[in-house]
Each structure stands twice: as structure tokens, then as C-alpha cells.
Regions:
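Phosphate/nucleotide-binding beta-alpha loop and adjacent structural elements of enzyme active sites
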Residues: 1-184
Length: 184
């Protein structure tokens, strides 16, 4: 038995899941699944949630946050500060809208790519509306330009416990090169 749901007109749907209101773009598979099933990478999320609480983590860095599903879901952990990084302006704009509507004070957003240098880079996406872009999939005709910087240039922390979620489409090595100081 398969269930099908079709959306017409306004692709953005608002839905409250576990006390957080999300604005989901049903043209995109992850958003659609989260809208219908109310979960996304639950196994990984539950591990992150448990480890953050168990280790009294001070900062959660959501590198490649997209529209912030991890940041939003973890925002209820007391005393946790969240830094969400994404190079795609539409993703950050949507995340900021959800931060505002949910009155969240512990999430700070950064509209930048992270790597081993400072400058500008071109990201390629399969569709114009997709939240996922890549530096390396140049066969896609849709693109956007973003600034790029080292994590070490953007935030400073001493003797704090960090939890990093890094999902940046094969650019992880370059991210790590730009995060040497913060990871010491």
C-alpha cells in the first residue's frame, strides 16, 4: 500500500513538529518526507542529542545547515549555543524566519561557505529551488555565488566543548583545514 500526496499552488507548508514550527518546501524530498513522516535522520539526531547532553556541550556548530533542521531540533537543549552555517541565502533566510517565529534566542546564522581560504565561490544546484548545492557538481546549470571563509576567522572559543555536524558535499577536508585552531 502506497500513499501519495500532491501539493499544488503554494509549495511552502507550515507544520509544528515537537513544539517547533517549520516552513517546509514540499518540492524538495527531505522537506516533503519531514512534512509527512515528521522525522529526518532520527538515528543521527538522537545520537547528537544524547552526546550533547551527556558531555555538557556548550556549542553546536551546524556546518552545511541547509535550512537548519538539526539546529532547530537541538535548540531546546538548555545552555546550548548553536551556530548555523550555510552558503545559500534562501536557506539562511528560511532558517531565520523559523528562528523568529519560534522565538529562539540560541541560534546564530552565518550565510557563508566554510573552507581553507577567504574569497568567493560558485555553487551548483540541480534545480533552482533546491536547498542543496555543491562546489563540485559543475554539470548542473543552476548556480549561485557565495562568500567563503575559514571557521577560524569567524568564531573564537577557548576551553569549550563543541559538537560539530558537517555536511558540505565533499568539501569536508577543506573545511577542516580552515578550522585547525578551533579544533585544537
Amino acid at each position: 500500500f502506497k500513499r501519495y500526496i500532491f501539493f499544488t499552488g503554494n509549495y511552502f507548508k507550515s507544520k509544528n513538529i515537537s513544539g517547533i514550527t517549520y516552513f517546509l518546501d514540499t518540492r524538495y524530498l527531505i522537506d516533503r518526507n519531514f512534512y509527512l513522516r515528521e522525522n529526518y535522520e532520527d538515528y543521527l539526531y538522537s545520537i547528537a542529542n544524547k552526546l550533547i547532553i551527556l558531555n555538557k556541550v556548550n556549542f553546536f556548530l551546524d556546518i552545511g545547515s541547509c535550512w537548519g533542521i538539526y539546529s532547530l531540533r537541538l535548540s531546546g537543549i538548555k545552555k546550548l549555543r548553536i551556530f548555523s552555517f550555510d552558503p545559500i541565502l534562501d536557506n539562511i533566510t528560511r532558517l531565520k524566519k523559523m528562528i523568529k517565529i519560534n522565538n529562539l534566542k540560541n541560534i546564530q546564522t552565518f550565510n557563508t561557505a566554510l573552507g581553507s581560504k577567504k574569497g568567493k565561490v560558485k555553487f551548483y544546484g540541480l534545480e533552482k529551488f533546491t536547498p542543496n548545492y555543491s562546489l563540485y557538481d559543475k554539470r548542473h546549470k543552476n548556480f549561485t555565488v557565495s562568500k567563503i571563509d575559514k571557521l577560524d576567522n569567524l568564531i573564537k572559543m577557548n576551553k569549550k566543548v563543541l559538537y560539530l555536524k558537517v555536511d558540505i558535499e565533499r568539501h569536508e577536508y577543506h573545511f577542516l583545514l580552515g578550522a585547525k585552531n578551533i579544533l585544537k
